[in-house]
């Protein structure tokens, strides 16, 4: 699977099928609850509850659940989770297992949640390849990419949602720093879940701030959600089109 976590960078996830299955189940239960109980479409962006079992609760940093049975769980007030937008299943499939991609995640938010479809990139423009050695951040690489006038207008819309989600790793867990295979402030080595030896480094701090294409600034996922929720009609209309 192209989105399975890299065993060098994320050895703690190797073979964790309980987590993977729980991620899928959460999304199924949450969306069914949204539709069956006629809850507002804004719940796709943010909600004060989700459905968790012990493994997924631990992944999200939520205490108090034991065992494999899913329960409707109220999230802590300042939790970055809540809504489809920040569910681990979505965050996993919008990464490639090695690095997160603000572009993939940004396009997902625009297309699936807001109903806006960015134009495909010009064939002459190469894709942005993240630097897993840690020498340059994805934000720096995208800034250089936007210097091309043919890329700037679309990336002004795509990049901000992706930046807001950068505080979540390739499996949707909260992080404060990137990991790299080459450079960083701290070397981490050991044996992974599958018994493989690994070495990686704690890299630069994550920056999840940004500015929407209309000019509104945000610092982190919760402020970004509030900006999206200023236009609930767009979210509701797009949900109807998706069903």
Predicted regions and their residues:
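Active-site substrate-binding loop specific to GH73 endo-beta-N-acetylglucosaminidase modules
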Residues: 1-241
């Amino acid at each position: 699977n192209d989105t399975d976590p890299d065993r060098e960078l994320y050895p703690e996830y190797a073979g964790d099928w309980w987590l993977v299955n729980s991620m899928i189940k959460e999304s199924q239960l949450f969306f069914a609850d949204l539709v069956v109980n006629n809850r507002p479409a804004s719940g796709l962006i943010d909600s004060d509850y989700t459905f968790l079992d012990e493994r997924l609760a631990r992944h999200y940093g939520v205490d108090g659940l034991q065992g494999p049975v899913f329960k409707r769980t109220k999230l802590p007030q300042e939790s970055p989770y809540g809504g489809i937008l920040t569910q681990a299943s979505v965050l996993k499939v919008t990464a490639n297992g090695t690095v997160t991609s603000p572009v993939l995640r940004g396009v997902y938010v625009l297309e699936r949640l807001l109903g806006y479809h960015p134009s495909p990139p010009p064939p002459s423009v190469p894709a942005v390849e993240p630097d897993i050695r840690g020498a340059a951040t994805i934000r720096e690489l995208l800034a250089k990419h936007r210097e091309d006038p043919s890329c700037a207008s679309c990336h002004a819309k795509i990049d901000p949602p992706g930046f807001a989600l950068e505080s979540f790793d390739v499996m949707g867990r909260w992080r404060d720093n990137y990991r790299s295979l080459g450079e960083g402030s701290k070397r981490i080595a050991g044996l992974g879940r599958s018994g493989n030896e690994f070495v990686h480094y704690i890299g630069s701090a994550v920056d999840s701030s940004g500015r929407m294409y209309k000019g509104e600034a945000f610092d982190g996922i919760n402020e970004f959600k509030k900006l999206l929720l200023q236009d609930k009609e767009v979210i509701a209309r797009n949900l109807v089109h998706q069903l």
